[in-house]
Amino acid sequence: MAKTFVISDTHFNHAGILSFKDYIGKPVRDFDSVEQMNEAMMDNWVSVVGPKDTVIHCGDVLFGMDKADWMARNFDKLPGKKRLVVGNHDNLKILAPFFRDMQLWIDMSDKGLLFTHTPQHESTLAESHRFGSKPLLNVHGHIHTNPSPEGPFKCVCVEQINFTPVDIEELI
């Protein structure tokens, strides 16, 4: 049976992110090079996602120079049907050929999930789900190693999910 996975803020090809530190001074991505980081995330993706699965990417797919070339050489090697929730660093013109669809959010209220790039205000979550039977869990990215706000939030930035897509059934 096909599964649905989620991941966010891969920042493929973003060499600068390797120098970022968290609030206690620890590197947010402990890799020796951008190539090692890219390879680790791609290997992790391939290890859990099958060709019939779907992957919701909650934004900030890649960064840096030669984005279109990097996507053409690498992204199609990753299995699964890819859906994008647009992030603040995403170039839609470059990314469009590689995603089945691109949205500002994906509402799976039948499963109690709302996928966004940034955490939404709790009142937005309550309002968007007032006719349903399940409360919405806001599955989001953007904040990297920072904690999600209190309440119905789950960050799926790669730094918080061991650089590996997560099966949404684990979130429900």
Regions found by a protein language model. Give the residues of each.
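Core catalytic region of metal-dependent phosphoesterases/phosphodiesterases
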Residues: 2-8, 12-108
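Conserved beta-sheet core of the metallophosphoesterase superfamily
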Residues: 97-172
